[in-house]
Amino acid sequence: MAEFIHGNQSIHYELAGVREFRLRTPVLLLHGNGEDMHIFDNMIAPLLGAKGFVLMDSRMQGESFSLDGGGEISYSAMADDAAALMDELGINEYDIVGYSDGGIIALLMAMKSFKVRRFFTIGANTDPSGLTAKAVREIKTALRRANHKGDERTAALLSMMLNEPHITSHQLAGIIAEATIILGKKDTVIDRKHSERIADAIPHGTHVLIEGAGHDVPDRKSVV
C-alpha cells in the first residue's frame, strides 16, 4: 500500500490489476462511510487480469489519517483528495465506481472534472432527503452512541451523512460523463425515486435496479 500526502491528510491507496493500467482507462474505487478499500476485493477479483484499479481509503477512514489531527470531513474534501491522487498518478482519463458515500464523491468529481470518462454510483444520494426515514433513525442512533463514547471521528462522519451533500439537479445537468446510477432493489437506505431522479437529471444517465440486492451491492454483483 502506498501513501499520498494531500494538505494535512495522509491518503493510503493501492494499484491493482494490469500493470499498464494508465493506458487502459483505469477504474477508481471509492468506498462508503467508515469503510475502507477492501469492500471491493470480491468484486474486482475476477477482473484483475483485464483492468487496472486505483483503490483508496477516503480521508480519516481505513488507513488514511490526518497528519496533525485536524482537517475538514466533508464529501467535497474527499472528492478533492481523490482528484488530486489521480493527478499525482498522472492519470488523465478514468472511470469511477463509488459505493454509498463513494457514489456521492464520484458525482462531485464528475461535476468538476472532464477527466472522468464514465462513472457508476451504488446506493448514492444527492441530498440528505434522499435517505429513507429508517436510515436517518439508524444514523442518529449511531451518532448518539459515537458522541457518548467520545468518538469524534465517527461522529463527524455520521453527521456528514445527515447534513450533506446538497447537489442540485442543475449541477447534475452539467455532467458530461456517462453515468450509471445503481440501486439494490431491496435497499432500505436510499429512496428509490430519489435515485431515479439522479439518473434522470444527468444527460447521459441510466438507472439500474439490482434484483435481490440491498444497500450492499459491492458484495453481490460486479458492476465494472
Residue ranges and their predicted role:
Residues 156-171:
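Active-site nucleophile elbow and catalytic-triad environment of alpha/beta-hydrolase enzymes
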